[in-house]
Amino acid sequence: MDIPRIHTISESAHRIHNPFTPEKLATLGAALRMHPGTCVLDLGCGSGEMLCTWARDFGITGTGIDMSPLFTEQAKVRAEELGVADQVTFIHGDAAGYVAEEKVGVAACVGATWIGGGVAGTIELLARSLDPGGIILIGEPYWRQLPPTEEAARACLAGAIADFLLLPELLASFGHLGYDVVEMVLADQDSWDRYEAAKWLTMRRWLEENPDDDMAKEVRANLSSEPVRYATYTREYLGWGVFALMKQ
């Protein structure tokens, strides 16, 4: 069980697999006003930076699930580095359908809502693990401005313009699902750069070390095209944020 290899190559040096900086992750943690001992479930946890740093900074405990063996191992190493291995647990597995054995105070899916077939299904899944009065965290893209054409939307790596909403529409959609939006922290172009541009040096170094790998041609093509594609489309049109929700 793994995610596509191009992602584990291009993001192998990432600690945060979303367009967030460490500062934004810390801002989100502080905004949630979690008490020490709050239990957090993170579905699609990547390399575990959210759980590990929040365990260090806010005293939370938690469990993270991710499909990538590489990222799961990185998460365990990071927990040891930060001295929080006794507070957080990381499991290599499919987060789709995962429900915690004991209810949690915060249930999160930050940038992987495909596990529930979209935002609504992911919220429904997370709610099954949540304490009454708990908080759901959803990380999701939105359009900063509507792409002018469907081709431009696809160049943002969306399937179509209809895949994402404008920010006011996305916020309204949570209300339609019966949830109050109680906090949000949004990516900006600088944090997008840290997510996307960091891939380029990683790919270049990987190519130098693996010139004969079966993936070398695809990685080279990505390295050649991604900077211009990203600057032209994703950076201009696509937003991303983490939204804190509570049942109405």
State each model region's role.
Residues 18-36:
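Conserved alpha-helix/loop element of class I SAM-dependent methyltransferases that forms part
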Residues 38-46:
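Conserved class I S-adenosyl-L-methionine
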Residues 49-96:
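Class I SAM-dependent methyltransferase SAM/SAH-binding core
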Residues 97-107:
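A short acidic, Gly/Pro-enriched loop at the edge of an enzyme's catalytic core
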Residues 105-119:
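A short SAM/SAH-binding and catalytic strip from SAM-dependent methyltransferases
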Residues 120-135:
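A short glycine-rich, Lys/Arg-flanked "PGG" loop and its adjoining helix->strand segment in the class I
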Residues 141-161:
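Short, glycine-/aromatic-enriched active-site segment of Class I SAM-dependent methyltransferases
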Residues 183-248:
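Conserved Class I S-adenosyl-L-methionine
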